[in-house]
Amino acid sequence: MSNQRLEPPDHIRRRSILRCLFEGVEGLGVAVCVLLSWPVSRKWLKDWGAIQAERESTWPGDSLVDSNHKTVTRAIDIGAPAEVVWSWLVQFGFGRAGFYSYELLERLVGIPVVNVESIVPEWQLLSVGDEIVLHPKSPGIPIGLLKSGEYICFGESPETRDAASEETPGRSWSMYIEPKNASKSRLILRSCIEYSEEMSSSEKLASWFGGAIDFVMEQRMLRTLKRLAESDGAH
């Protein structure tokens, strides 16, 4: 496990207060609309931005869960080279560059995150087995697979998961960068969660609610990474 500070270094550029507030208001509006419409809109938003080939492909991180799982695939085109996108993506995590999503909403639910808008050299190296923190009071999530410049997959394989973890469904959460040409790339987010028909009603409700919230936060994360990479690549 990597040693990680829970506060970013003093020399980095943080997200402006104005942008944080503006995006926070946007996030509240998006969250309300998505939650109210999720029974209908889920069909289209579950795989937001992904094409059929991306939805139907088998990705490396899929191997971190049992074969009986459900998938979510989301994607976005980015007008920047893959290496530029990677330099932002690899900084993901609490105490690092943040989650690139709605900082105000994250703070409202008790996550004191700081979203960073600059490349920090000390955050550019990760390895399989390193853990990324999502909340200062929660265990980190391990990196199960990683290929520098191409993908990072969070989760543990069924073979290495400990007995205590077996009581909860296995899950993998992965991001892939595919170059389209020298100046454009595609960022793909893939989530797999083990599913059982024996899930209780409360577990199914929690999964349903969690799916809506995941969409709200993940679409903003993808859009923020696009903005940062395109701004960086234009310099």
Question: Where do the model's predicted regions map?
Answer:
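Beta-strand residues in well-ordered beta-sheet regions across diverse protein folds
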Residues: 86, 155, 188-190
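Beta-strand/loop substructures that line and gate deep hydrophobic ligand-binding cavities in soluble
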Residues: 5-22, 54-55, 159-219, 223-227
